[in-house]
Amino acid sequence: MKIYVVATIAWILLQFSAWTTTDAVTSITLDLVNPTAGQYSSFVDKIRNNVKDPNLKYGGTDIAVIGPPSKDKFLRINFQSSRGTVSLGLKRDNLYVVAYLAMDNTNVNRAYYFKSEITSAELTALFPEATTANQKALEYTEDYQSIEKNAQITQGDKSRKELGLGIDLLLTFMEAVNKKARVVKNEARFLLIAIQMTAEVARFRYIQNLVTKNFPNKFDSDNKVIQFEVSWRKISTAIYGDAKNGVFNKDYDFGFGKVRQVKDLQMGLLMYLGKPKSSNEANSTAYATTVL
């Protein structure tokens, strides 16, 4: 009997150890019921502060830098409205989207994910509300071009720019997937807006300032917004390798005019590219324009 009891206790302790070593996923919530510009800015700051390494600084600037990859792989973003919550999953080491969670028209929680970015087990940890049976791999990929194609945008250049940005727009597209039967077009449009209103505003204060300036109204996006969004790696690499005391060693053009002062880019968060370079290394590093 004693042996049985000891074995049972040991098994329980082993299970408890396994449970407690499972990394808790950090959640950050944006309340979309009468939000203010200040509340939205605080929400964006929380994203930056959660993923940055306070000890990392690139190019002699004070711009936040994402920390190196760690065991805490994902960040959960919750959008709350008067009708419920829709959640977005982001990778902590680059803020790329991996999944979203929403109730369907029968009030069942369903998790939809990009299979190249997250496993079923990781998805369960990220969105425990959805059972494995209610997980579905998306039929398209996580890049903007693929999502835009499925969003079926017919205006202008048929890109996400044509949808605009803004808190009111985020709420509109959130409600299109909240407690509704799945419609791929609505889903893709929600993802396009949600990604930009979370990851992109965290990366670029320029975009954040447009949102708060027009808050809470929808506003037309512009080419500069799109150029920023496709240039995060290029900008981060230039600051990392070719800036000293916040000044580039030469003029750079990322698609919206030449810049020499890093501050003119209004950056909010840089990509992790390793340990900061010394001043001598930065001065001797020529930025490769072919970097994607």
From Swiss-Prot:
Residues 1-24 form the signal peptide. InterPro entries: Ribosome-inact_prot_sf, Ribosome_inactivat_1/2, Ribosome_inactivat_prot, Ribosome_inactivat_prot_CS, Ribosome_inactivat_prot_sub1, Ribosome_inactivat_prot_sub2. The active site is at residue 200. Its EC number is 3.2.2.22. It catalyses: Endohydrolysis of the N-glycosidic bond at one specific adenosine on the 28S rRNA. One of its GO terms (biological process) is negative regulation of translation. This is Ribosome-inactivating protein saporin-2. It comes from Saponaria officinalis.
